[in-house]
């Protein structure tokens, strides 16, 4: 059985997604991902591409909210750390 989503985790995911989705169109582009990650420190274009490849499971060039949720569920610790920053 899958682990239930904690209400705080859900709120954190929504807040983080909105932070990355700078133009508010409901999806995260590689540009938005890179620009937001730059606020956390140096990130290379190769690192952004790798992250896009990992999270963008349908390969349309954007991270949808559902793709982000699936990534967040698989990486709960990482998302909690990111939530502390944002």
Swiss-Prot record:
UniProt keyword Calcium, yes or no: yes
Binding site residues for Ca(2+) 1: 21, 23, 25, 27, 32
InterPro entries xrefs: EF-hand-dom_pair, EF_Hand_1_Ca_BS, EF_hand_dom, EF_hand_pair_protein_CML-like
Pfam families named among the record's database cross-references: EF-hand_7
Keyword Iron: no
Key words of the record: Allergen, Calcium, Metal-binding, Repeat
Signal peptide (residue range): none
Source species, domain of life: Eukaryota
Protein known as: Polcalcin Nic t 2
Gene Ontology MF: a single term: calcium ion binding
Domain EF-hand: 8-42, 43-78
Gene3D superfamilies with a match to the protein in the record: EF-hand
Gene designation: Nict2
Binding residue positions for Ca(2+) 2: 56, 58, 60, 67
